[in-house]
Amino acid sequence: METFLTHPLGPKMKERAKLDDLVVSTRIRLARNVKDTVFSPVLSKEGERQLCDRLEGRLRGLKGFEYLHMRDYDEVTRQALMEKHLISPAVAANEESAVFLSEDETISVLINEEDHLRIQTLLPGYQVKEAFELANQVDALCAESLSYAFDEQLGYLTTCPSNIGTGLRASVMLHLPGLTLTGRISPILRELRKLGYTIRGRYGEGSDAAGRLFQLSNQRTLGSHESQLLADFMEVTEQVIQAERHAREELIAHRQEELEDRFYRSYGILRYAKLLSSTEAIERLSDLHLASDLGILSDWSPPKFHELIVRLQSGFLQKHFGKTLSTQERDRERATLVRRTLDQGLV
């Protein structure tokens, strides 16, 4: 377990990747349920425990994975795993949930989430096809040991009707400061929802978009083959990316002085503040990331932006110090950590 919490990013997430100035990460999730087994929402705690033990026994053969049962870890540890996107908020909140986690942190097989099984792959930058291929391979390995709930007409049966069919959910984490600062983000979000896509904050449903970070996902999984769903998703994602590029060009062309003032104010706060909330830290770091992308500030890399965001979250921060911290203590240590990072340079 400790290997997963020593560093804020796994080895793959530290690598530079395609379009990583705008796309922080790509995630593929496959929802699966076990045949002839009551679905998760109506399972008792004892039923969840039995299912967890059963799936652990069946999937123990997965090579290169570590099995983590949530009941064995405290709330802060689970929160830190969630902050790294290795488990979902639902798994973090349930002691009878578990995860098979790959050594390189690119694959999570979640047990007792909304569905019995959720296979997740996470890669840096814009790598939709690669993430799907990886998830497909893990799905095939799991299917060797499990019989899935499947209907010839409907496809994979899932707890939520929106997941029935392929059970496929593709997501990209997008950094969209240009659209946000130009005021264009709201109409784009409305249009995306009309097209059947969801857009949320960093941790999915119910979370905010601090740092202008948005999670774009497909909503429809029924009635189309995986290849068509992915093609449609990639087309929409690339349209959003293009809109963000245009918004950034407009900002540089017409509002450069205002931008420079904003960036240096954020740098000053990060460099000298004694207390920083996680929300303010992310917002200010988002400004620095955009400044680097636009050539106004140098010595920055997209993985460093992502790494700092994880490192400054409450759970990971407390794991770093090895103790529970009050809100003010977290804000103090967060500010200290940012100052030390800037002292060492941004790269």
From Swiss-Prot:
Annotated protein name in UniProt: Protein-arginine kinase
Organism whose genome encodes this protein: Exiguobacterium sp. (strain ATCC BAA-1283 / AT1b)
Superkingdom field: Bacteria
Regulation: Appears to be allosterically activated by the binding of pArg-containing polypeptides to the pArg-binding pocket localized in the C-terminal domain of McsB.
A cellular component term, taken from the record's GO annotations: extracellular space
Broad EC category: transferase
InterPro entries with a match to the protein in the record: Arg_Kinase, ATP-guanido_PTrfase, ATP-guanido_PTrfase_AS, ATP-guanido_PTrfase_cat, Gln_synth/guanido_kin_cat_dom
PANTHER family on file: ARGININE KINASE 1-RELATED, ARGININE OR CREATINE KINASE
Motif RDXXRA motif of the pArg binding pocket involved in allosteric regulation positions after renumbering to this chain: 330-335
Task performed by this protein: Catalyzes the specific phosphorylation of arginine residues in proteins.
Keyword terms: Allosteric enzyme, ATP-binding, Kinase, Nucleotide-binding, Transferase
Family the UniProt entry places it in: Belongs to the ATP:guanido phosphotransferase family.
